């Protein structure tokens, strides 16, 4: 069996609203069939917008660096380095970097997904 590996710096970076994204595990990157993963970087004060959901699967995020808050189905919780959060299938969610440094997050998806499995929810935001 061939080892299927990719270094973060070798993955194409996509500039998306509120974040920079690199797919690390996907059908294209390493021929994954049942899961996918990406790393995102979120600048201080930025929100991953628009709020969205994944109608065909779950997402787990793991905060590698930085701090902020998540919105999941109307519930807001703080997140810091070392925090993992489940975004259940179909639940509207978003991420906000409230810290003073760049936030770095690994996002895991099951089953495998891509940007085509994002259902956008314009107008949903954090309550302030």
Language-model region placement:
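A short, N-terminal "cap"/entry segment at the start of jelly-roll beta-barrel domains
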Residues: 1-34, 117-128
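A generic "binding-loop/recognition-motif" signal
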Residues: 56, 75, 91-92, 101, ...
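Conserved short histidine dyad/triad with adjacent acidic residue
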Residues: 21-26, 38-54
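Short acidic-glycine-tyrosine-enriched beta hairpin
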Residues: 74-89
């Amino acid at each position: 069996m061939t080892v299927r590996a990719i270094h973060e710096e070798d993955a194409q970076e996509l500039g998306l609203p509120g974040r920079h994204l690199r797919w690390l595990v996907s059908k294209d990157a390493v021929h994954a069939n049942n899961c996918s993963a990406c790393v995102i970087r979120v600048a201080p004060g930025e929100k991953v917008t628009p709020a969205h959901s994944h109608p065909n699967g779950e997402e787990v995020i793991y905060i590698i660096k930085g701090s902020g808050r998540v919105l999941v189905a109307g519930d807001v919780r703080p997140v810091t380095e070392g925090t993992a959060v489940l975004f259940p299938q179909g639940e509207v969610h978003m991420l906000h970097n409230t810290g003073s440094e760049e936030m770095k997050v690994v996002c895991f998806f099951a089953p495998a997904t891509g940007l085509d499995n994002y259902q956008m929810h314009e107008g949903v935001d954090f309550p302030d």
